[in-house]
Amino acid sequence: ISVSVSFIFLFVLFGAILDTAGGGKYFLNLAFALVGRMRGGPAKAAILASGLTGMISGSSVANTVTTGTFTIPIMKKTGLPAIKAGAVEVAASVNGQIMPPIMGAAAFVMAELLGIPYFTVVTHAFLPAVISYIALFYISHLESLKLNIKGLPEKEVPNLKKTFFGGIHFLIPIFILIYLLLFQRWTAAS
């Protein structure tokens, strides 16, 4: 377990450094650039941003604070009731706990106790995590239809190309981490 604990610390540190460097804001802007114009765009952007932020933080509380302080007021501004805006953000942020590659402390402890590679835990968690985010996206779409909530005006949505390339350096450490975990079978013991 001591190997797992030190590994957890490194992943939490990785997420904290990436977020402090602006990675959380980058993922938020990228999410709004991708889905902000859609019907119920702010709710969908909150879900997408929480999924992306959850990949690096593994903490539902950190995820909610990082994305929710920005997304909840925008969801409310477009007509989503406050309680539903909060529910969307919390549900999406809690799902960050099951979004690979970080997945919170439970995944590391699970791999250690079961004696299986962390890679195995990550690959088995990926599909359920994606399905949960698709379900949240669909529910927010249905709620947007029911409440007749439109997307954000074009002028309020960041430019996708400019946003993506303006923060592409935040994706490099994530791709390196995924490469090490998946292709080099990097584990807590290595």
Mark where each language-model region is.
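Core transmembrane alpha-helical segments of multi-pass membrane transporters/permeases
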Residues: 1-25, 189
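Hydrophobic alpha-helical transmembrane segments
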Residues: 5, 43-45, 122, 171-172
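Helix-loop-helix module between adjacent transmembrane segments
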Residues: 14-20, 49-63, 92-98, 128, ...
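Hydrophobic transmembrane alpha-helices that form the pore/transport pathway of multi-pass ion
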Residues: 30-96, 106
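Alpha-helical transmembrane segments of multipass membrane proteins
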Residues: 51-52, 94, 109-113, 175-179
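Helix-coil boundary and interhelical linker segments in multi-pass alpha-helical membrane proteins
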Residues: 111-127
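Long, contiguous bundles of hydrophobic transmembrane helices that form the permeation core
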Residues: 123-190
